[in-house]
């Protein structure tokens, strides 16, 4: 590097620091009201539906029908408090935490797959959780998701035209996604891996990666996915093979591997157009597995019917669209990418959960944001909404005239 190039790079870094300080010290406006209202609405509806869906299971497990609801409500309060606190903090501060988040995520992902680890929790033939069972537990993949979003947004926003190069625009991001994907597949956690890969890919695309590389990447991922499905169907890959077979026709083994999906379809169909009424689901009485977790949307369809389910999907759609509107109007590139990453992940997770319970894609462990039982997941979702609200507070005011 020549002296002139060094001086130019030094001057550019100084300008970036000045810009960041300016944004940090800038007077903040109010939070985006439509986004805030939609977030609160989904949180409240989610708690109501969780109370209804979880009552029989909670009574069967603990003797207290409100057990799961009370725990979720407590985490909702904590999460909402966190959302408002994060919404008040300037989102630029997350830049400094991006590398620390990646390091923490990798450490936790390695920790969860260590054999005979007393802190690792196994359920449904997958070891995805850390903590003390029945007291406190969380999925390291949730931390990994946030780490990828913040790190990608931070580094991509600084590179700009360098995103067109292999060395700086492709290799470091693909390498990180590859490491995280391998660690998550060892749990195994296929759905979480797909979500993180897709979110990372979208951020790279928005960040300026070349179109032909995107097409090649999508083609490669599609080929690998198709190969996995074919190998699972043939029985070569044991993990997921039964799920894929039952996805084609759950009635082939109704009392075995096809039971969960078959019950989900029965639950959805039982609701009809208007539903059986809030709290009146019959399938939640231990017929439908995971009725308060991954398959809670089936209970929503049964109790509220097609119309109620469509209203909830509309609220999700409005929240996601409003989030992307905030991204389009963000003050800077980092804020825009941060919101795009958060909303992309939310959109994909919501779509995949509904697709799973409806039988459009093979059954896999993926929760419905704001609805499924899981305190730490809900807290992190609300904190992410707080990050979006923080970006919305610094949207430049429209010029008069």
Please name every model-derived segment:
Residues 2-37, 41-42, 48-187, 354-369, ...:
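Membrane-helix boundary/helix-loop-helix interface segments in multi-pass membrane proteins
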Residues 47, 83, 149, 153, ...:
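Alpha-helical transmembrane segments of polytopic integral membrane proteins
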Residues 74-79, 303-323:
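Hydrophobic alpha-helical transmembrane segments
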Residues 77-79, 99-106, 167-185, 190-232:
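Hydrophobic alpha-helical segments of polytopic membrane proteins
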Residues 120-137, 216-311, 331-335:
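Hydrophobic, glycine- and aromatic-enriched re-entrant/interface helices and adjoining loop segments
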Residues 156, 194-213, 282-308, 367-381:
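Interfacial segments of multi-pass membrane proteins
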Residues 168-173, 196, 217, 247, ...:
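Alpha-helical transmembrane segments of multi-pass membrane proteins, especially transporters
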Residues 327-365, 371:
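Loop-to-helix entry and N-terminal half of a specific, functionally important transmembrane alpha helix
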């Amino acid at each position: 590097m020549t002296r002139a190039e060094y001086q130019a790079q030094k001057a550019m870094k100084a300008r970036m620091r000045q810009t960041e300080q300016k944004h940090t010290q800038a007077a903040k406006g109010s939070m985006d009201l439509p986004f805030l209202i939609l977030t609160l609405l989904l949180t409240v509806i989610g708690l109501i539906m969780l109370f209804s869906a979880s009552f029989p299971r909670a009574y069967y497990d603990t003797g207290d029908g409100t057990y799961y609801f009370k725990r979720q409500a407590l985490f909702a309060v904590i999460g909402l408090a966190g959302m408002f606190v994060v919404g008040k903090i300037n989102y630029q501060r997350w830049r400094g935490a991006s590398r620390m988040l990646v390091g923490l995520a990798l450490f936790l992902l390695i920790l969860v797959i260590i054999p005979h680890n007393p802190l690792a929790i196994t359920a449904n033939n997958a070891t995805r959780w850390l903590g003390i069972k029945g007291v406190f537990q969380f999925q390291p993949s949730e931390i990994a998701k946030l780490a990828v979003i913040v790190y990608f947004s931070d580094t991509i926003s600084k590179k700009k035209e360098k995103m067109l190069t292999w060395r700086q625009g492709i290799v470091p991001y693909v390498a990180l996604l590859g490491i995280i994907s391998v660690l998550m597949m060892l749990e195994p956690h296929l759905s979480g891996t797909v979500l993180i890969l897709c979110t990372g890919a979208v951020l790279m695309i928005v960040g300026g990666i070349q179109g032909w590389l995107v097409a090649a990447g999508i083609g490669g991922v599609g080929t690998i996915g198709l190969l996995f499905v074919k190998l699972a169907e043939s029985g070569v890959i044991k993990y997921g093979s039964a799920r894929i077979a039952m996805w084609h026709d759950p009635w082939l083994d109704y009392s075995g591997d096809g039971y969960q999906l078959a019950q989900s379809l029965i639950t959805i169909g039982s609701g009809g157009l208007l539903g059986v009424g809030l709290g009146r689901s019959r399938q939640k009485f231990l017929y439908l597995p995971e009725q308060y977790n991954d398959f809670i949307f089936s209970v929503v369809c049964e109790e509220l019917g097609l119309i109620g389910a469509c209203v909830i999907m509309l609220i999700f759609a409005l929240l996601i669209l409003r989030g992307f509107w905030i991204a389009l109007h963000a003050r800077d590139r980092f804020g825009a990418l941060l919101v795009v990453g958060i909303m992309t992940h939310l959109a994909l997770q919501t779509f995949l959960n509904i697709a799973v319970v409806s039988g459009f894609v093979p059954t896999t462990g993926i929760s419905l944001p704001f609805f499924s039982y899981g305190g730490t997941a809900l807290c992190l979702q609300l904190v992410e909404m707080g990050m979006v609200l923080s970006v919305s507070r610094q949207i430049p005011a429209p010029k008069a005239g």
